[in-house]
């Protein structure tokens, strides 16, 4: 593992040889990184803020996070090991002078430094517009041009605010944004980080009513990830041009920095090299790429240097990183691991634009695909055999683009063809419309089930649950739902799973004492037929 000092030296050497100089452009494209949480988890996997800004591979950094606000007293920040243990007297607000010094270094190099509010962990939100307006004054005093005895970054002044509001309610955020606009200069950046299902469960109405400079749409941990047939950048582009108060708002393609950075939705560089130029050429609202997070990307075999070259070269394929810029890839042990199996996966049809037709020839035994009328078809001894999904469900491709399942959906049309990851991207960028997975609703919770992969005997999926009130999830969360009779849930990465009949209970151990969202990986078996998603009703989170 590279030390922070050596990492910085390696980056500097690489930049000296290439002449790359990062700087924010109001017209884009830009590369943005979330920094502060060290989600890679190693003692040396997160370098200092200044190191990333000096790399020449970052146009903006999002300080992550100001995670507690408007719950009484002054707010709190959490930057993992980058700032720990030194609090202002009689508060839980950290004093981070080293980060303040690095903010100035970044700004001297043209890199924007944006404070991200919210995140998965923490407690936050407003109950009125007046609270939102008052909090704008707090941000001005603590991080802007105002005065306070408790300024975490000293006299450094941030360049913007990012609303990464994962849970709670929409109340007060429009008033907050409008008040920020009145206090800060016209070049102060205000962004948001909605999840890709449209409209966002929390920020949907806020995005329609307040003026944002960019939105970091999270294309991961959901059905609308970039490698699935429901990739919906076109939906967000349409919102930018028709609904957003700021018709020049930029849509950032936000992705995980490595396979361990998210529950699902990681896009390898080989696929990004197809997606990014397609987005850049097709959508005028495209603003570049945002990444969760710096610690993951910089420990992913040159991902960071290749991405920056890709985005700023107009999408042409960058050369492989030189040895001086390469960083050692680290691995992270997770609660669940992928088993190696000899089972033939129900791979999707390989002919772009074609749909299987019952009794017509096919070439790959046990190949699965969606038909034009919402059924699913299996290649059986050289012919397609079509079957109907259970009542009220339709055939939907999995998020990895390699298989299918039957699920509850909204919208109409066809999900056919289900094709490979690169072919899916081409189809999706063509503004393909069709049914998408229906949200799961429970008391005080909005959730999505993203089915990441299936084969003949097993499945993997991600439950993405978000609080819709100001009350967070606690350390222990019980998740209950009903599953079809042919499906057995057996594992989760957050705690034990028990299934009696078709009743499933997951005893999830939250990574945080309090959080506004839960992302739970689950696995299980398929006794017969194909994977059928659980009913969207009768879900409980307690």
From Swiss-Prot:
<keyword id="KW-0732">Signal</keyword>
<feature type="signal peptide">
    <location>
        <begin position="1"/>
        <end position="22"/>
    </location>
</feature>
<protein>
    <recommendedName>
        <fullName>Chitinase 2</fullName>
        <ecNumber>3.2.1.14</ecNumber>
    </recommendedName>
</protein>
<dbReference type="InterPro" id="IPR050542">
    <property type="entry name" value="Glycosyl_Hydrlase18_Chitinase"/>
</dbReference>
<comment type="similarity">
    <text>Belongs to the glycosyl hydrolase 18 family. Chitinase class III subfamily.</text>
</comment>
<comment type="subunit">
    <text>Monomer.</text>
</comment>
<dbReference type="Pfam" id="PF03427">
    <property type="entry name" value="CBM_19"/>
</dbReference>
<feature type="active site" description="Proton donor">
    <location>
        <position position="166"/>
    </location>
</feature>
<dbReference type="GO" id="GO:0000272">
    <property type="term" value="P:polysaccharide catabolic process"/>
</dbReference>
<keyword id="KW-0147">Chitin-binding</keyword>
<dbReference type="GO" id="GO:0008843">
    <property type="term" value="F:endochitinase activity"/>
</dbReference>
<dbReference type="GO" id="GO:0006032">
    <property type="term" value="P:chitin catabolic process"/>
</dbReference>
<dbReference type="InterPro" id="IPR001579">
    <property type="entry name" value="Glyco_hydro_18_chit_AS"/>
</dbReference>
<dbReference type="InterPro" id="IPR005089">
    <property type="entry name" value="CBM19"/>
</dbReference>
<comment type="function">
    <text>Probably involved in the apical growth and branching of fungal hyphae.</text>
</comment>
<keyword id="KW-0865">Zymogen</keyword>
<keyword id="KW-0119">Carbohydrate metabolism</keyword>
<keyword id="KW-0624">Polysaccharide degradation</keyword>
<dbReference type="InterPro" id="IPR001223">
    <property type="entry name" value="Glyco_hydro18_cat"/>
</dbReference>
<keyword id="KW-0146">Chitin degradation</keyword>
<keyword id="KW-0326">Glycosidase</keyword>
<feature type="domain" description="GH18">
    <location>
        <begin position="29"/>
        <end position="314"/>
    </location>
</feature>
<dbReference type="InterPro" id="IPR045321">
    <property type="entry name" value="Cts1-like"/>
</dbReference>
<feature type="region of interest" description="Disordered">
    <location>
        <begin position="312"/>
        <end position="356"/>
    </location>
</feature>
<keyword id="KW-0325">Glycoprotein</keyword>
<dbReference type="GO" id="GO:0005576">
    <property type="term" value="C:extracellular region"/>
</dbReference>
<keyword id="KW-0964">Secreted</keyword>
<feature type="propeptide">
    <location>
        <begin position="447"/>
        <end position="542"/>
    </location>
</feature>
<feature type="compositionally biased region" description="Low complexity">
    <location>
        <begin position="323"/>
        <end position="354"/>
    </location>
</feature>
<dbReference type="GO" id="GO:0008061">
    <property type="term" value="F:chitin binding"/>
</dbReference>
<keyword id="KW-0378">Hydrolase</keyword>
<feature type="region of interest" description="Chitin-binding, high affinity">
    <location>
        <begin position="355"/>
        <end position="406"/>
    </location>
</feature>
<dbReference type="Pfam" id="PF00704">
    <property type="entry name" value="Glyco_hydro_18"/>
</dbReference>
<dbReference type="InterPro" id="IPR017853">
    <property type="entry name" value="Glycoside_hydrolase_SF"/>
</dbReference>
